[in-house]
Amino acid sequence: MTHEEHHAAKTLGIGKAIAVLTSGGDAQGMNAAVRAVVRVGIFTGARVFFVHEGYQGLVDGGDHIKEATWESVSMMLQLGGTVIGSARCKDFREREGRLRAAYNLVKRGITNLCVIGGDGSLTGADTFRSEWSDLLSDLQKAGKITDEEATKSSYLNIVGLVGSIDNDFCGTDMTIGTDSALHRIMEIVDAITTTAQSHQRTFVLEVMGRHCGYLALVTSLSCGADWVFIPECPPDDDWEEHLCRRLSETRTRGSRLNIIIVAEGAIDKNGKPITSEDIKNLVVKRLGYDTRVTVLGHVQRGGTPSAFDRILGSRMGVEAVMALLEGTPDTPACVVSLSGNQAVRLPLMECVQVTKDVTKAMDEKKFDEALKLRGRSFMNNWEVYKLLAHVRPPVSKSGSHTVAVMNVGAPAAGMNAAVRSTVRIGLIQGNRVLVVHDGFEGLAKGQIEEAGWSYVGGWTGQGGSKLGTKRTLPKKSFEQISANITKFNIQGLVIIGGFEAYTGGLELMEGRKQFDELCIPFVVIPATVSNNVPGSDFSVGADTALNTICTTCDRIKQSAAGTKRRVFIIETMGGYCGYLATMAGLAAGADAAYIFEEPFTIRDLQANVEHLVQKMKTTVKRGLVLRNEKCNENYTTDFIFNLYSEEGKGIFDSRKNVLGHMQQGGSPTPFDRNFATKMGAKAMNWMSGKIKESYRNGRIFANTPDSGCVLGMRKRALVFQPVAELKDQTDFEHRIPKEQWWLKLRPILKILAKYEIDLDTSDHAHLEHITRKRSGEAAV
């Protein structure tokens, strides 16, 4: 961004006013969005107003519409719900109510409205916008506003952010609040699992989501449920028979519990509701199992927002302000949404229309159509769920291949979920699946055993690495590894791990020249808390680590708020990769995050101290600074602590905290469980294809570059990239990719912490259109 453009961003909002409101059901992460809208709005020179109690406040006016300040949104990032209140409003549905709302906005000179809510709230906003000029002329005729006021407010810009735990809005992969709701559900499922196992019980869990089965579907994927009922895919007519058969099969395989997940809107093929009580009675009557029903209810809306929702809310809030301030009378009302990990702007009414089309398709019992309209990510989840839950592994292993699965590097939450789905998809495809203990070292020593279906039972929710993992690389023991590949007849290798898994893959590629046995296909699934594997925007385990850091930072901020005038310096893990420090800084509202990728000098440290000195003069008397463990070999955590302590004498005192290995532990978050499960399934499907491709004269021979890949999430899709091609994109000395997408989020972190900097927020989002899936297209 040039100096001129930076100046333009700083003055973009001068003379403009933005109102922000939250409407409809509350969702965790709404506060992060409100905070970002307020702070970025103020940064650009605009005036920002809170509208309390949703549309009701807009209609009532008066004290419900208050100007926001920088400090008024402090300490709200970690709160659930919405601080400015929300209400379902009948008045706004009537034209009379909208007329009063228009009057309240015009009188304050507000022409930009940011609405955070579900599809109903956003549709209401669009109606309001389309009537705007008529409402103004009515107000003029009635003499309530002057001609000058009418000219000044001649058009209304509207941007919507989707805040809803149901994830039922088409056009965005994730709505604000969905991830946190999944956190609440998984906490409960994990807790129920232990009691169910003790008593050999069957639990029927009912989750929220109205007419959208997203929460139920992802929950069942993340906890390995026996059955899921969702409105988009009603079960076949003989489902009672099928369900009971499945439950008794899992029991005979040795499982001590059954879990059935029911979406609150679940129906059968004829549109008749299927309730949790119906299911309980069926299981008790036919199988005689001890069965309990748990309806989760409003617990799902509560609690602290997850790191994902805080970052999502913050990113969406920034993009919303930019969309509002760049708006003209001709730009349609848009909604800021997430596609893959990119912020995009979509026309509001297109999204609302597709969302309505889903309901219409379901009313007309066109369930396939409804499923397609839900989008790529929903279809993906459904396909993987069906594979893992519904298909029985074939008994005969004729024509099967042998695939080995291993963990390499440091433990990361979600590794076990990836192993589980890899093993099970392998078995479903009729392959023999071996598991290797202790990484490449175990492969050399022959610590290899065959895994059956129940070997990986209940692994999804367990943290760490059950197979055992080591950082050892294969090069030193190629001879033993080759011997074991031959001995166990291994024809494909799935390597789940961090940077060592990737470098190990490169070494295997090199070794193919000397050892023919190494000419087998392999795929690397990135799993490391550091998120430093080239070829993927995300690694399995990073989300769990991020949430752990976030929770700790919240507690530390609380302690600092109590003692006043205190600055905490926190050291995070990640090697040379600053992902955890940056993202945790964004999610916890840090004042600064020092990372290796963005070199800093003593002058920068000095500037940060001065910034904190200024901050102590405001009502917010606390500071939080994150430092990545290897950001600078001389400016260590101790050095920064000593510098802050000395420079802050008499103004603030400092404390330091090194988080350490707690960041590798904990049970995996819903995101990591789901991501790992999908990656495992995708990797195994690729592997089966590659083995068939490389099968010649009765043996496997794969020596092409594309037979050794990293499976990674790139912007909007999961892609396989040959390890050899990724070599040029890697900084091997510092074990990081040369280009990292999240660096573009750093300016947001600084602006939200009140630094005067350039506003270049990632790849600039332009208005796009919804791409509808044709029936023949495969889900990515």
From Swiss-Prot:
Changing residue 591 to A: In GSD7; Italian. It is an enzyme of class 2 (transferase). Beta-D-fructose 2,6-bisphosphate binds at residues 471, 528-532, 566, 573-575, 629, 655, 661-664, 735. The modification N6-(2-hydroxyisobutyryl)lysine is found at residue 557. Changing residue 209 to D: In GSD7; loss of activity shown by complementation assays in yeast. In human PFK exists as a system of 3 types of subunits, PFKM (muscle), PFKL (liver) and PFKP (platelet) isoenzymes. This is ATP-dependent 6-phosphofructokinase, muscle type. It comes from Homo sapiens (Human). The gene is PFKM.
